[in-house]
Amino acid sequence: MILLSIEGMTCPSCVAHVKEALDAIEGVNKVEISYENARATITTNGGVSVTVLIGAIEALGYIAKESTGTAKEITSPNDCCDNENASNTESNQTQHVAIIGTGSGAFACAIKAAEGGAKVTLIEGADVIGGCCVNVGCVPSKILIRAAQLAQQQRNNPFTGLENHAPQLSRALLTQQQTARVEELRAAKYQNILETNPALSLLKGWAQFKNANTLIVRKNDGTEQAVHADKILIATGSTPTIPPIDGLTETPYWTSTEALFAQELPQHLVVIGSSVVALEIAQAYRRLGSEVTILARHTLLYREDPLLGEKLTGCFEKEGIRVLNSTQATKVTHDGSQFTLETNAGDLRCDRLLVSTGRHANTCQLNLGAVGVTTNKKGEIVVNERMETNVPGIYAAGDCCNMPQFVYVAAAAGSRSGINMTGGYAKLDLSTMPAVIFTDPQVATVGLTEEQANAQDIETDSRVLEMENVPRALANFETDGFIKLVTEKATGRLIGAQILAHEGGELIQSAALAIRNRMTVTELADQLFPYLTMVEGLKLCAQTFNKDVKELSCCAG
């Protein structure tokens, strides 16, 4: 009998792979393995060397050595270890799920898979867990936006009895407070879950596929470890896309990460791009005191209803943000203190340059070709409504796959992946997915635009309500923007909403629920909405399909 200690086994699935390799060796009569005790007990006919056994195990990526411990003597192949130490049979083994990434989609999947009885290994190569949202995305950006909003209110509030004044601010202190809150949320929402859920474990390193059930993880110390799993989720997120502009990569340009955590305010910030992130950061920096110029390849929000981009551009220009539509940089240089951009609208100079032209999936380092996982032209992993790829047992969620790049979509996809991995059945329906851009006024959308509906041969009817007709907006002296509702003309059923309004994001979920429940605008107009609230604007806009709300008294139905 030979006793071996084995490092690297994390679940019964690992046991199965090691046992299969040892059973295949001629002369091995019986193999008993316990991953809890990290050891194997092997009975042979006496003609098998320890070196051969260790070699078979290490070929799978584990570390093995002969154990110095003692074990119960086995006198025949029919003997076995005590039942409490015996390895599980295939029928009752705990399923092992491996997850590449530790963002919102990854953790949502891990929690659901654990609830389904699985053991979960999360694999992360970055220095910190949590992914983009909590670390360098949603959370720090909303803190920055809120601080900038308060600065703007001090500088330019609408009330005649409140004196406007220049805010006294420290960018360094704002960043310090922002970083502290990021660390607090990362600890509460990610690290704490790892520490309190015994079904979850973390492996630090960068993963690549070896086959459909095996990942090779290159750890930070340079060693490699094989991770065998019954199911695998890819949740590797995305990275800022850098356009191929002559000279750009030779300059100290910012991505959103540098912009969010900067210690000083630039005098003049030029923003290449008109992505969601570009618009949010551009306005925040303007409100904190920087001169800001946006270079938009087309127009702002050109993929959305044209009225949204037109009105938001007007709001930006009113705040002093320079928006250059149909403008592209062809060359960028830096002289040590100033950037110079050559564009089709002339040369621009600035002391800081933000490049924010979108993000692309982190998939190129995964060795997806080894297993045949399908990606699209953008490198995004193609998944079905159950979040499964074309390879059975391999799933994907979040920015790395062909879905909208929103953290709540990633989390929903991760949850459904975890359910489907552990024997359940869950689909992700994005037909009423709300989206918000946290500019001020905010842009909020759900469902179809008129153009999208017409492309589907749906005849539409729509109404636009200016925010000056919403009592709460009037009371706030914040009447920029509008609410637009799109209906299927034949039925009056609401199929889309586009909103530009202060706190417009707080309105959009009500519209989403109305669309989800196939409500008509007549039914929506008949609902009770609290007075004075911004969301009452949905009711008022719905009423405009049948009457002129300017002729109604307050709260009139």
UniProtKB/Swiss-Prot annotation:
Annotated FAD binding sites = A106, A126, K142, A207, D399, V407
Q: Which reaction does it catalyse?
A: Hg + NADP(+) + H(+) = Hg(2+) + NADPH
- Required co-factor? FAD
In this chain the HMA domain maps to 1-65
Q: List the disulfide bonds.
A: C133-C138
Under SUPFAM superfamilies, the record lists: FAD/NAD(P)-binding domain, FAD/NAD-linked reductases, dimerisation (C-terminal) domain, HMA, heavy metal-associated domain
Q: Which domain of life is it from?
A: Bacteria
Q: What Pfam families does its record include?
A: HMA, Pyr_redox_2, Pyr_redox_dim
Per UniProt, Hg(2+) binds at C554, C555
Q: Which amino acids does the record list as binding a metal cation?
A: C11, C14
Cofactor binding note from Swiss-Prot or TrEMBL: Binds 1 FAD per subunit.
**Keyword Metal-binding attributed:** yes
What is a biological process (GO) this protein takes part in? detoxification of mercury ion
Q: What is its EC number?
A: 1.16.1.1
Entry GO MF terms: flavin adenine dinucleotide binding; mercury (II) reductase (NADP+) activity; mercury ion binding; NAD(P)H dehydrogenase (quinone) activity; NADP binding; oxidoreductase activity, acting on a sulfur group of donors, NAD(P) as acceptor
Q: What are the protein's UniProt keywords?
A: Disulfide bond, FAD, Flavoprotein, Mercuric resistance, Mercury, Metal-binding, NADP, Oxidoreductase, Plasmid, Redox-active center
Instruction: Tell me the protein family, please.
Output: Belongs to the class-I pyridine nucleotide-disulfide oxidoreductase family.
Q: What further fact does the record state?
A: The active site is a redox-active disulfide bond.
The record, for NCBIfam families, names: MerA, PRK13748.1
Write out the function statement from the record.
Resistance to Hg(2+) in bacteria appears to be governed by a specialized system which includes mercuric reductase. MerA protein is responsible for volatilizing mercury as Hg(0).
Assembly notes? Homodimer.
Q: What is this protein called?
A: Mercuric reductase
Q: Which species is listed as the source? A: Shewanella putrefaciens (Pseudomonas putrefaciens)
